[in-house]
Amino acid sequence: MSVKQLGYLIFECRADVLEQMVVVYQDIIGAVVERDEGGRALVRLDGRPFRIRLDPGPANRLAAIGWNVDPSDLAAIAEQVEKACYSVVTADAELAADRAAAQVRQFADNDGFTHELYVESSFPTDPVLESLFVCGEEANGIFGLGHLVVIVADRAKTQSFFTDVLGFGLSDRVTWPEADIFFLHCNQRHHTVALSAPALGLKPGMVHHLMLEAKSKEQVDRAFAAVKRLGYDVLMTIGQHSNDKVYSFYMMAPAGFAVELGFGGQVIGDLESWHVGFYDAPSIWGHELQLPAH
């Protein structure tokens, strides 16, 4: 009984930032972005109506993290969350439809993140997008939309919540002078969430970065070139990570967090036999930190 995958993310953005984020996802990352009547931007990486949604709002913030669960596990996981002293609210049909979900249960954690346990509604395939992104359920396992690195006040308590309540496993730990991060998995993706204590100038409740995974190295290289061509800031140059072996770069998104686009992430074939790793550097090569251009 555990979360299956990171199914969707909802961000609120100021109007000017929302338009800039559309450029990030559509013109740099290569996703499909559709607009609805309310001015929201729906970012598609596969056939689901959205994997990332950008809602107009007064501030830039992560509004909801959608955790996909099996229908048979929803009530039990929600009960476990309640036992961990978090109040769980069953969303009505209108909110579930807004999330393109069959059922949704919400709770907020101590760092201010809103989590949504949801049962997926059926959606069509999209062969074009599915040829571009590692997302959702693939032939070799479940991967979800990508991974999220967040800043938390009490890392040990938060890690325990993810592992003991939501059913995640510890992938590895990377410790270097600037940060100390724990990486957690819930499926074949090396990590779906990573937890950091306050570091790198970030405070609890903030997002360090969102990672999306391309299916070709060329996609990453083209996106890296597009960042520069379109005048956005590179946060870290192309490099390869030590723990999940991803080839990637990071750009600084206008919404106040980084977006990583990677290729070739390590796959966890057998969750039961995974051995936790420990690393003293986040990258094997590259990923050189860049000063903002403006």
Swiss-Prot record:
Gene transcribed to yield this protein: dbfB
Domain VOC, first and last residues per copy: 7-120, 144-264
Physiological role: Responsible for meta-cleavage of the first aromatic ring of 2,2',3-trihydroxybiphenyl and 2,3-dihydroxybiphenyl. 2,2',3-trihydroxydiphenyl ether, catechol, 3-methylcatechol, and 4-methylcatechol are oxidized less efficiently and 3,4-dihydroxybiphenyl is oxidized considerably less efficiently.
Similarity remark: Belongs to the extradiol ring-cleavage dioxygenase family.
One example GO MF annotation: ferrous iron binding
Assembly mode: Monomer.
Keywords: Aromatic hydrocarbons catabolism, Dioxygenase, Iron, Metal-binding, Oxidoreductase, Repeat
Root EC class: oxidoreductase
Cross-referenced InterPro entries: Glyas_Bleomycin-R_OHBP_Dase, Glyas_Fos-R_dOase_dom, VOC, Xdiol_ring_cleave_dOase_1/2
EC numbers, comma separated: 1.13.11.-
Keyword match Lipoprotein: no
Example GO biological process: dibenzo-p-dioxin catabolic process
Positions bound to Fe cation: 147, 209, 260
Protein name: 2,2',3-trihydroxybiphenyl dioxygenase
Chain ranges passing through the membrane: none
Cofactor(s) of this protein: Fe(2+)
Organism, scientific name: Sphingomonas paucimobilis (Pseudomonas paucimobilis)
Key word Repeat present: yes
